[in-house]
Amino acid sequence: MQFLHAHLLSVVIFFPMLSALLAFFMSDQASRAYAIVIALIELLLVLLLWHGFDIQTAGMQFEEMKELVYQIGVNYHVGVDGIALFLLLLNAIVVLLSVIYVKERRKDFAICLLLLEGILMGVFSSLNMIFFYAFWEISLLPVLYLIGRFGRNHKIYSGMKFFLYTFLASLCMLLGILYIGYDYANNYGMMSFDILDWYQLNFSSGVKTWLFVAFLIGIAVKIPLFPLHTWLPYAYSNAPTLGSVMLSALLSKMGTYALLRFLLPLFPELSEIYLTPIAIVALCMIIYGGFLAYTQKDLKTLIAYSSFSHMGVVVLGVFSFNVEGISGAVFMMFAHGIIVMGLFLLAGILEERTSSLEIARFGSIAKSAPVFAAFFMIVLMANVGMPLSIGFVGEFLSLLGFFATYPLLAIIAGTSIILSAVYMLTSYKDVFFGNLKAGNNQISVFEDLNAREVGVLSVILALILILGIYPKILLKPIEQGSKQLLEVIEIRSLPFLGSLDTKIKEVSYVNR
């Protein structure tokens, strides 16, 4: 127990990855039960982090540091704040529900999901940029395997487009990481890739700009930001159901997390200088993504563009530079992960029953599957930001925070979100209450949800409603992380490095 308490965060990172290796030696049937047990234990470990997290304490918590290759600044350094903590929780919840949902190819999915869970735990808690980048890149492999092995039409093309876009963009970020590591050595006489050390650096104006661009490109493709999103409809719609869940609920959050952890605190001045073009890009995501979703004939592609559109609201919250907006963005990242998981699982059930996702083929499903229709409606309403649902809270806070920064664009973004209600409710009407084409027997005898599907979706609905009615459970620790981030951004904006060193220690963000 003493070891677990001292190294809890490391256990959270490596336990699912090591457990995934053991699944190689199990049968298909046994691997599913095994994966459920491992994912449940992992969730309990994350809840231990939650229980031990002190919202009154500034700085990183559960911090662990081990020197590995000191000469080149490669150290194992992990820790969490109020922002990272909830992405760990989201990761644990999504993976547990996913392994429970798995219906076929259980062994392959169990291994990929557990591997990805551990890798993402590493992404959200790594404070050494070499480890962060390693986890960031390795996360591509399990998802690429799921798309290429179990995807729909054009799965190879979709997988390769996803891989090449994200891998090549990440190389830009790698160049920036290596440059800053060497720049730190020039300033302090030793190399460091520790993000908390980097907060002490001041970059020259010319170098600062290209470093900002290098990081932004690597991050933008992962979210993805417009116009670097063209891999998204292929990957999301052609991946198997759980592949789509991983991409939309978890991997997209890597990008917005990197904005908060790296881009804003390292380059606060440039983040403010380029606020207007970035905000316009986010607004394009909301409007353009909404119109594209409205025109889709395939339900899964519609959900993909809906996800893309909602991530635009998250980006606006991130660049609000105030507690309300950033807290709203983090809350919405969590909410979006839960909601979009529900939508893709429901779409997957529809595809399993009918071998199609073409909206025009459906109709009158509510008559034969009223429980399925009810679940779909509740998740759909959360997606459009219905009050008292989890989708409303993050969206409202993000736009409220951005309104204080850029009122006109916030108003346009707020009114544009009406689009999501239009395309979601229109597609719902067509699928569940539209006229059924004659001879379509698969739809007329549509089987309602089974016990396992009801169980998984009930957990999603409980989260949607409980956290929508009582969001304070999440918002308190998130607010703590947002305030710390803003303190670092403000300090990094000071003109003199001497003041910067002193102030960082005063707010205790560097917690040695």
List each language-model region with its residue ranges.
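Alpha-helical transmembrane segments of multipass membrane proteins
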Residues: A20-F24, L96-V99, G118-S125, Y145-L146, ...
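Helix-coil boundary and interhelical linker segments in multi-pass alpha-helical membrane proteins
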Residues: Q2-F3, M121-M129, L260-Y274, V314-F331, ...
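Juxtamembrane/interfacial segments at transmembrane-helix boundaries in multi-pass membrane proteins
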Residues: D54-N75, L171-H229, Y234, L259, ...
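Predominantly late transmembrane helices and immediately cytosolic-facing juxtamembrane segments
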Residues: F226, V340-F344, I411-V445
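Transmembrane helix-loop-helix hairpins at membrane boundaries of multipass inner-membrane proteins
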Residues: M1-L8, L22-I111, D194
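C-terminal ends of transmembrane helices
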Residues: S19-D28, V95-R106, Y145-H154, K222-S237, ...
